[in-house]
Amino acid sequence: MNSSILTGIFGGSFDPPHEGHSEILKSFFWEVSDCKEVFVIPNRQNPLKEEKISLPENILEMLNLFVSEFSQSIRILDLELKRSGPSYTIQTIQELKTIYPNRKFVLLIGEDNYSNFHKWKDWEKILTEVETIFVFRRFSKEVPLNSHLNSLFEFKFLENPLIPVTSTDLRKSFFQSKVPNLISKKVLDYILKNKLYSK
């Protein structure tokens, strides 16, 4: 395999995947044209967030439907779903570097994760394991700099469109028997058919 292949790592709950995720990926491929593939990696449990609702098989099926609408190379990996307990990014990166020794990796994180990145497990080690960390904006055009980080590593900020939606908000809409926007038709049909977020 060509050592020049640059690969993005995009983790998250994806419970469910939505248009915000879509715009992030589109912006990333547009701005980082030398990146040929992105690994989308759903976590089993984010140590800093609430527990997930859907079963792993539901998450994977929704993601398969979600990425089917992209022309770029996006691969879904279930290595974090197979682990028990919290999902730690450092463990995932090191595992990927073992599986794909000739690839170079960049990490995609949201502005919220950028703000608390210094609270992640082995966060300083992560900075040595990836080429770059790209930060996507979710709710604000200007992301406050994290003073714990920028003297150690150059983070790059994507110019993605702001789509203020979260998977948590979408689940709440479903729980309230409201059909939300900002979900692709394929994913929405799957959710409704399988009653994933019904009371």
UniProtKB/Swiss-Prot annotation:
* GO biological process assignments: NAD biosynthetic process
Pathway membership, UniProt = Cofactor biosynthesis; NAD(+) biosynthesis; deamido-NAD(+) from nicotinate D-ribonucleotide: step 1/1
What is the top EC class of this enzyme, as a single word?
transferase
What InterPro entries does the record tag this protein with?
Cyt_trans-like, NadD/NMNAT, Rossmann-like_a/b/a_fold
Q: Does the keyword ATP-binding apply?
A: yes
Q: Which reaction does it catalyse?
A: nicotinate beta-D-ribonucleotide + ATP + H(+) = deamido-NAD(+) + diphosphate
**What GO molecular functions are on record for this protein?**
ATP binding; nicotinate-nucleotide adenylyltransferase activity
The protein's superkingdom reads Bacteria
Q: Does the keyword Nucleotide-binding apply?
A: yes
HAMAP family membership:
NaMN_adenylyltr
Q: What does this protein do?
A: Catalyzes the reversible adenylation of nicotinate mononucleotide (NaMN) to nicotinic acid adenine dinucleotide (NaAD).
Q: What is this protein called?
A: Probable nicotinate-nucleotide adenylyltransferase
Quote the gene name from the UniProt entry. Answer: nadD
